[in-house]
Amino acid sequence: MSDTTLFRTPVETPRTCHPIQPQDGCILLGSCFAQEMGNYMNAYEMDVLCNPTGTLYNPASISLLIHHALRNTAEEDLPVFTNNGKWYCWLAGTQLSGNSKEEITIMMKEKLSLLKAALQHASHLFITLGTNICYRLKEDNSVVTNCHKMPANIFTESALSVEECTDTLLTMTNELLSWNPHLGITLTVSPYRYAKYGFHKNQIAKATLLLAVEEVCHTRSEVSYFPAYEILLDELRDYRFYAEDMLHPSPTAVAYIWQRFCQSYMSEQTRQYLREYEQILKGLTHRPSHPDSPQHKAFIANLETKREELRRKYGLQK
């Protein structure tokens, strides 16, 4: 046994046939783990859109948002509501709120238009599924993305079956590919553990999602799977790689999975761009002793020049 595998069992992460080029547009939707990967891509100034309406957790919520984005029109009514003087939308997280129905509607339509345009031109879409638990409004049985701390008695909670998850994801995939036939879709299951449902129920949820994703990938060759869940649970496999809450992956684990993600989905040219940009990031995040000194200002100006040269070199837009 080699030294590199002595204390771990490596999870295979096959290389994609359609790797991300430096100038490619990418979309990340789903749980907080999607946000973690999106944060890395944003830090390297890649063309990425991540959860424009907030965090999403289950296949039904993600599919519903995509459907509304692709069918977004000025005339379409959105599921908005008011609480304590503020207006919210059942398709979005709590960070999107307005002082009137008109304001929240305009905000949501702008976000949906942003997502629609991105889906039309993006080369890659990454969807991270967190759970199969779904919440619906009792009054009309409609799916909600976020409960917005509203009374529990206005919702019903249900666990989507493997068949329901599969059908939902396949319908979503068909709709996406009819809109953008060149879109590469990657599904992954979040390694975050949903303790609020109990660990047994969490495992059932993850198993349900994994079985559904397997069926979708088998049915549609355009869809691939990235094993973030397996990397944390089967390869890293240690509480050292969890945050203080023992539920979220630690920054070290996220960084490791990011590296594995890059190996699988980034082209050699993109990985070279990331390596070169890393040097600029180190300079930009350096804490100087005298930030107002002429020397430091010249240092920052030089970094900005290198940054612009690097972006032009790899064909990245501003």
Model-inferred region functions:
Residues 1-318:
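Extracellular glycan-modifying ectodomains
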